């Protein structure tokens, strides 16, 4: 019988480090729920000591997620471990993941320490983490460049101290697959107590071989793989979990292992991460790219028509990509929309039916037929904007021509007030943004603007994603409409609401901190 490979997702911790704009607590919860539905065994959701916001998001996810083990990162520092435990204690069970560098370069130049001191510190911190939970993971940072004898000493000591998972990361993406396999097998040969812990691997894609390294390590005995959906992460990214998962499934004949992942949720989880993180998936991306199952060669097309297995080693359906697209019209009722969402695998908690149906009717009146991809796009926007809005675009009008200066007029609802403004700009989108800035007096700099079609044909929905800089922080906004100028305006209003909510959260955190301080003084 094949052994299980534990899937450890770090999209919300290591993956988030690559994003241009930080995710809100709500956005992180959306991703966490998608990962839970996909069946990841462990999800690393943040570094709680880094900021009050990260602490809050880890705590919220730990309180919500029930079917995956929630994990938080901590350096081998007492405060890190204590804060991680505090953020996770609302969960029924949790993991603390602590780490320290073990390579000669890192020990000498970063830690300015010795291997013996590193081992002593690792032992102390693993034991401290065990005071809070019986699920402790220890990572040897830069293990790929650590001599095997040194690595074996650290691993043996960490296991003796109580670590239940030992992670061997290729921190800088330097190791070749055959080298990585040798490291894993070398540890099995050298560490006498290695059977008391799960050996994990964490790979980076600097040389384009993160997935190959992970699979080589699994073949050599590793039984946990760490990575991120779509391979997102700093520098060249992390190991793409969907690729590892499907490689294990498709090549079970030689891998002789399995995962507990619900493969039919891979596509939707990948799309959720892509859209919320504002990181488009390349068309030629393995498993989840739009071209992953496309065949343009005549010979290939003929072979697929005769037998799909001629050129397809897996089916689109195996990752949850439904190629049968149905359409609804303005005559379709709420029950029909709800039924179609259920057929596509969505749960009622994934969207607000009232809001979705209102948006559906408006779109159906404009374009006649609404397809599955339209519904999914509407549901995504619906989820992003379901919180109460302080700002709302009530009206806009734009005048623009090839030789005219673009002029925009807007009516913006700001809390209990309605404000109107007009402005000129370098094109219709810039004119609207200038008018909005005049209303709010927010000093916003547009950093990135992206437009993507959600569907096919001239009446396809256009999704605009923008990233702005405001007071040294970056915020992401998204808008959706058949009119790209309207999409652009909605994206900026979404940004305004995100800025406003962030300010409200900051006020609440300050209030809690002040109350805590007052309570201390009272005691």
UniProtKB/Swiss-Prot annotation:
Cofactor(s) listed in the protein's UniProt record: Mn(2+)
GO terms under biological process: L-leucine biosynthetic process
Main location: cytoplasm
Pfam families, per database record: HCS_D2 (PF22617), HMGL-like (PF00682), LeuA_dimer (PF08502)
Enzyme nomenclature, EC number: 2.3.3.13
Gene that specifies this protein: leuA
Keyword terms of this UniProt record: Amino-acid biosynthesis, Branched-chain amino acid biosynthesis, Cytoplasm, Leucine biosynthesis, Manganese, Metal-binding, Transferase
Gene3D superfamilies assigned to the protein according to its UniProt record, in alphabetical order: 1.10.238.260, 3.30.160.270, Aldolase class I
GO molecular function: 2-isopropylmalate synthase activity; acetyl-CoA C-acetyltransferase activity; manganese ion binding
Protein name (Swiss-Prot/TrEMBL): 2-isopropylmalate synthase
Localisation per UniProt entry: Cytoplasm
Annotated GO CC locations: cytosol
Sequence similarity: Belongs to the alpha-IPM synthase/homocitrate synthase family. LeuA type 1 subfamily.
HAMAP family (alphabetical): LeuA_type1
Subunit structure comment from the entry: Homodimer.
UniProt-annotated stretches for the region Regulatory domain: 392-523
């Amino acid at each position: 019988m094949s052994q299980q490979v534990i899937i450890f997702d770090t999209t919300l911790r290591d993956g988030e480090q690559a994003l241009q704009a930080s995710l809100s607590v709500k956005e992180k919860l959306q991703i966490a729920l998608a990962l839970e539905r996909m069946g990841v065994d462990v999800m690393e959701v943040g570094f709680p000591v880094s900021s009050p916001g990260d602490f809050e998001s880890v705590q919220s996810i730990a309180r919500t997620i029930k079917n995956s083990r929630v994990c938080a990162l901590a350096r081998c520092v007492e405060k890190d471990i204590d804060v991680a435990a505090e953020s996770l204690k609302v969960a029924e069970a949790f993991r603390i993941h602590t780490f320290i560098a073990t390579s000669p370069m890192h020990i000498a130049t970063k830690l300015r320490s010795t291997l013996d001191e590193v081992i002593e510190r690792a032992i102390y911190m693993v034991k401290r983490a065990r005071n809070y939970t019986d699920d402790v993971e220890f990572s040897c940072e830069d293990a790929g460049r650590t001599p095997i004898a040194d690595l074996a000493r650290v691993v043996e000591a960490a296991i003796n101290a109580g670590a239940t998972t030992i992670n061997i990361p290729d921190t800088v993406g330097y190791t070749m697959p055959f080298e990585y396999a040798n490291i894993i097998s070398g540890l099995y040969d050298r560490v006498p107590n290695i059977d008391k812990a799960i050996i994990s691997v964490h790979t980076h894609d600097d040389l384009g071989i993160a997935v190959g390294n992970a699979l080589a390590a699994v073949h050599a005995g590793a039984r946990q793989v760490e990575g991120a959906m779509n391979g997102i992460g700093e520098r060249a990214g992390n190991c793409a979990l969907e690729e590892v998962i499907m490689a294990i499934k498709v090549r079970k004949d030689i891998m002789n292992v399995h995962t507990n992942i619900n493969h039919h949720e891979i596509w939707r989880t990948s799309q959720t991460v892509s859209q919320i993180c504002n990181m488009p998936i390349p068309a030629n991306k393995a498993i989840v790219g739009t071209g992953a199952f496309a065949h343009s060669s005549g010979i290939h097309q003929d072979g697929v028509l005769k037998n799909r297995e001629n050129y397809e080693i897996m089916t689109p359906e195996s990752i949850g990509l439904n190629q049968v697209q149905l359409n609804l019209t303005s005559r379709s009722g709420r029950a029909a929309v709800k039924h179609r969402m259920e057929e596509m695998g969505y749960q009622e908690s994934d969207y607000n039916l009232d809001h979705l149906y209102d948006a559906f009717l408006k779109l159906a009146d404009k374009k006649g037929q609404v397809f599955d991809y339209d519904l999914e796009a509407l549901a995504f926007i619906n989820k992003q904007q379901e919180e109460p809005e302080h700002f709302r675009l009530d009206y806009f009008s734009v005048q623009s021509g090839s030789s005219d200066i673009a002029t925009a007029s807007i009516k913006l609802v700001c809390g209990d007030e309605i404000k109107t403004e007009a402005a000129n700009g370098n094109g219709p989108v810039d004119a609207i943004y200038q008018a909005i800035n005049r209303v709010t007096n927010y000093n916003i700099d547009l950093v990135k603007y992206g437009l993507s079609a959600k569907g096919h044909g001239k009446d396809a929905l256009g999704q605009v994603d923008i990233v702005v800089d405001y007071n040294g922080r970056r915020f992401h906004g998204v808008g959706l409409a058949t009119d790209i100028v309207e999409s652009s305006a909605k994206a900026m209003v979404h940004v305004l609401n995100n800025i406003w909510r962030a300010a409200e959260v900051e006020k609440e955190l300050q209030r809690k901190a002040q109350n805590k301080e007052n309570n201390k003084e009272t005691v």
